[in-house]
């Protein structure tokens, strides 16, 4: 049995890796995609079985449902994640410009306020 870590030491956790290379805990969107894909495979496979009573074909439909739902969720989530990162970067750059130019003769707000008062 391993000794508990001391209060000052960080606790080491093993991360869950899927297929040996996809770190589910640290990769954005991976966990949700896998969970929704699993649910999609169960629904697709079981639904197909209820309609047709063909076991092998239902398993194939379940695997196909897993692949489609997982990839669909993955691409949707990664697209939104990338879009959010771009918006954050643009906002960060604008804040830096605002801080840099505030109160100087290069401040765009100062030019607008100065020209409207004349």
Curated annotation (Swiss-Prot):
One GO cellular component term noted in the UniProt record for this chain: mitochondrial inner membrane
Keyword presence, Ion transport: no
Record carries keyword Membrane: yes
Mitochondrial intermembrane topology ranges: 2-33, 78-118
Domain of life: Eukaryota
Membrane topology recorded in Swiss-Prot or TrEMBL: Multi-pass membrane protein
Keywords assigned by UniProt, alphabetized: Acetylation, Disease variant, Membrane, Mitochondrion, Mitochondrion inner membrane, Primary mitochondrial disease, Transmembrane, Transmembrane helix
Transmembrane domains' residue ranges: 34-51, 61-77
Ranges facing Mitochondrial matrix side: 52-60
Any one Pfam family match given in the protein's UniProt record, by short name: Cox20
Principal localisation: mitochondrion
Cited InterPro entries: Cox20
Record GO biological process: mitochondrial cytochrome c oxidase assembly
Residues where N-acetylalanine is found: 2
Localization, UniProt: Mitochondrion inner membrane
Family: Belongs to the COX20 family.
Record's subunit section: Found in a complex with TMEM177, COA6, MT-CO2/COX2, COX18, SCO1 and SCO2. Interacts with SCO1, SCO2 and COA6 in a MT-CO2/COX2- and COX18-dependent manner. Interacts with COX18 in a MT-CO2/COX2-dependent manner. Interacts with MT-CO2/COX2. Interacts with TMEM177.
Cited PANTHER family: CYTOCHROME C OXIDASE ASSEMBLY PROTEIN COX20, MITOCHONDRIAL (PTHR31586:SF2), CYTOCHROME C OXIDASE PROTEIN 20 (PTHR31586)
Protein purpose: Essential for the assembly of the mitochondrial respiratory chain complex IV (CIV), also known as cytochrome c oxidase. Acts as a chaperone in the early steps of cytochrome c oxidase subunit II (MT-CO2/COX2) maturation, stabilizing the newly synthesized protein and presenting it to metallochaperones SCO1/2 which in turn facilitates the incorporation of the mature MT-CO2/COX2 into the assembling CIV holoenzyme.
Implicated disorder: Mitochondrial complex IV deficiency, nuclear type 11: An autosomal recessive mitochondrial disorder with onset in childhood or adolescence. MC4DN11 is characterized by walking difficulties, cerebellar ataxia, dystonia, choreoathetotic movements and dysarthria. Additional features may include sensory axonal neuropathy, cerebellar atrophy, and mild speech delay. Cognitive function is normal. Serum lactate levels are increased. Patient tissues show decreased levels and activity of mitochondrial respiratory complex IV.
Name under which the protein is recorded: Cytochrome c oxidase assembly protein COX20, mitochondrial
């Amino acid at each position: 049995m391993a000794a508990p870590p001391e209060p000052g030491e960080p606790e080491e956790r093993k991360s869950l890796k899927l297929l040996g290379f996809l770190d589910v805990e640290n990769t954005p969107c991976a966990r949700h995609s896998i969970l929704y894909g699993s649910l999609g495979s169960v629904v697709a496979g079981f639904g197909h079985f209820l309609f047709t009573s063909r076991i092998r074909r239902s398993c194939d439909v379940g695997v196909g449902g897993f692949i489609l739902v997982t990839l669909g969720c993955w691409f949707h989530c990664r697209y939104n994640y990338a879009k959010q990162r771009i918006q954050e970067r643009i906002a960060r750059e604008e804040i830096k410009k605002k801080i840099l130019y505030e109160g100087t003769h290069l401040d765009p707000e100062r030019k607008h306020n100065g020209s409207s008062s004349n």
